[in-house]
Every structure is written in structure tokens, then in C-alpha cells.
């Protein structure tokens, strides 16, 4: 059979957990923030695991000039190139955990903040592998991870925030 296009993204997930303010006094902005952070914490943990798997697998030396320029004369350019992304996942995971458990302040600028932060370096790796006749490798775990990142983003699911309509009317009337 014919494979799916590389940029294929059939679904995106959404949730209302932590965002259902439609008459529920227990769902506050604090609850919404915690739900979003827990989702990002879980996503970062899962992406970190997948990136570690790629780093272990990608020991080849042949790479694109773009990766070579970014990694210097490394004998393992893909590993060197992917480590900062994996480390950002690890940092995001641990920082959110410290915030939730110990109320340690978060520096949002250092956290993973968009799915493009995941996809851009993965695209560079994929292009390099394809350029160097490694299409089978590029179409394996790497492509799976790219599809997951497109589907789940940095929070695993988009949050649908529902607000009781009289609050909107009150705000508009003010």
C-alpha cells in the first residue's frame, strides 16, 4: 500500500478537563493553569523518552551540511544535534514537577512553549537523513515522533475553556 504523506495530521485532541467553568465553582483559573501544566509535564516526559531513543539509535556520521555546520566536526552529529532538544524536554518536565510539588517558580521562557520547537529540529534531521539516502530511517521512529508532536502538541490536548454565558454578557455590557 501507499504510505501516508509525511506532513499528514489526521486528528488533534481536545479536552475540557480543567476548563469547564460553565457553572462549576471548583474550576478556577488556578485549576486551569495546573491542568495545562500537568499536560505539558506529561508531554515533555514522553517526548524526552522518544528523543532519548532517537539519540541512542542515530550514531551515523553522514549528515547534511546544515547539521554539520551546527555540530562542528562531530563523529555523531545527529546525537549532538538532538541533545539540546531532549535536554529542553527534560528541563521542562523537571521544572514543572518542581512547581507542582514544591511551588518553585517557573521561568516560562526556558520551558518548551510551542510544538514548532519540537518540529523544526526534527524536520532538519529528517531532511538530512533523506539527503543522505537514509529514507527508511527518516520514515521510522523519527516520522512517528513528528506525527505525535503535530497531533498532541506540547500539552497532549487543546483545552476547551467553557464559561457560563452570563459572565460574557456582563463583560460585554460593561
Regions found by a protein language model. Name each.
Residues 17-18, 153:
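Extended, charged helical/alpha-beta scaffold domains that provide interaction surfaces
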Amino acid at each position: 500500500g501507499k504510505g501516508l504523506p509525511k506532513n499528514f495530521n489526521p486528528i488533534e485532541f481536545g479536552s475540557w478537563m480543567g476548563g469547564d467553568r460553565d457553572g462549576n465553582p471548583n474550576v478556577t483559573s488556578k485549576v486551569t493553569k495546573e491542568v495545562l501544566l500537568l499536560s505539558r509535564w506529561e508531554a515533555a516526559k514522553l517526548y524526552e523518552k522518544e528523543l532519548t531513543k532517537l539519540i541512542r539509535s542515530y550514531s551515523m556520521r553522514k549528515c547534511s551540511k546544515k547539521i554539520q555546520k551546527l555540530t562542528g566536526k562531530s563523529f555523531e552529529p545527529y546525537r549532538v544535534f538532538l541533545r539540546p532538544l531532549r535536554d529542553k524536554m527534560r528541563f521542562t518536565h523537571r521544572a514543572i514537577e518542581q512547581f507542582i510539588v514544591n511551588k518553585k517558580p517557573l521561568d516560562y521562557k526556558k520551558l518548551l512553549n510551542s510544538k514548532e520547537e519540537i518540529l523544526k529540529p526534527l524536520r532538519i534531521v529528517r531532511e538530512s537523513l533523506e539527503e543522505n539516502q537514509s529514507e527508511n530511517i527518516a520514515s521510522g521512529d523519527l516520522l512517528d515522533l513528528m506525527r505525535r508532536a503535530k497531533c498532541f502538541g506540547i500539552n497532549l490536548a487543546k483545552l476547551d475553556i467553557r464559561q457560563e454565558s452570563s459572565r460574557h454578557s456582563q463583560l460585554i455590557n460593561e
